[in-house]
Amino acid sequence: MKQIIFFIISIFSFLIPCGIAYLSGNEVVLNAVLLAFFIHWIAFIPAYIFQTEKFYDLTGSITYLTVVWFAFVSSYQSIFNNIGNLILALLISFWTIRLGSFLFMRIQKDGEDKRFRTIKPSASQFFMTWTISGTWVTLLSLIHISEPTRRY
């Protein structure tokens, strides 16, 4: 029964950001959201096989950077039209690299994140956790990834 609940949570965690992106009517936003989940789900495979969460936060940071720059590059017109978005992307990148490197170094130093001890053995629960991380990245980045893709 728990596996079904984890699966349902995973589905909704995926569909909600995809639905928001779809309703934006912008293909770049939808592709950025799909890219975020693709990265997380690919990273889940070795994490589950090797039963490790050591790259969980790092994957979130890499995904955040990828999504922000994907949206910026995909909507690039000229540096003069996008200077504000470029500055915002650079500031987001700085914050992401700072936080991601801190979390990655902490997990390397500690050896594990104790919260994952009971989660890792369950494929459905561990997958749900990776999917929710994809949701976190997409929902937090939606405000930025939708801005540079607007057409005035």
Question: Which residues are covered by each model-predicted region?
Answer:
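Membrane-embedded alpha-helical segments in integral membrane proteins
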Residues: 11-23, 67-74, 142-144
